[in-house]
Amino acid sequence: GFPWGTYNGGKASGTVWYDNVKVTPAPEEALYTREGEHIVLKLDRDKVTVSDADIDAWLSKLDRTYEAYRDLVGDVPFDGRKIMILNTPGIEPGYWALAGNPILWNSHVAVSKLLDRTVEFGDWGFGIIHEIGHVFSQGNISGTGRWNWNDEIFANFRMSYALEACDGTMSQR
C-alpha cells in the first residue's frame, strides 16, 4: 500500500484475518485482450466500443510511446516485461488510473470515451500515456518504487517528449 495513507489520510496497521473471502476469476469471455510489442491491454469487453483494428492502431501508438520513453530515460521498467493495462472496478474513488504493472484503469472512468476519441480525433490518450510516463520514473525503473508529487509534472514532461518524438496527437476536446 501507500506509506502515506489513502486519499482521505487514513493509515491502517496491524493484522486482520478474513475467513469468508472468495476469489472468483472473471470469465475469459468478459475480458477483451489485445497485445502489442510492449503493452498488453485487458479491458472489460463491454467497454470496448471500437474495432480490433482501431485497438491495434492505438496499441501501436502506445508501443511507440514506450520506445520514446526508453530513448529518453535510457532504460525500461520491469526488466523489459510487457506492461499490462487492466480495467478494474476496485481502485480508490477519485483515481482515473494507477501506474505500475499492471496499470490499473478504473472501469468507471472514461474507458469507452477514450477509445472513441482515439478513433474520432486521432487522440493518443492522455491518461494512459501519463500513467506509462510514471512507469518510466527512476523510482519504478530502479525498483525502489519511490514516488513524489514532482513526478506528476515529470510524467507529463515525458509524455510531451514522446508525443513530439512520435508526432503524436493529444486532443484538447
Q: Over which residues does each language-model region extend?
A:
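Extracellular beta-strand ligand-recognition surfaces/modules
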Residues: G1-V21
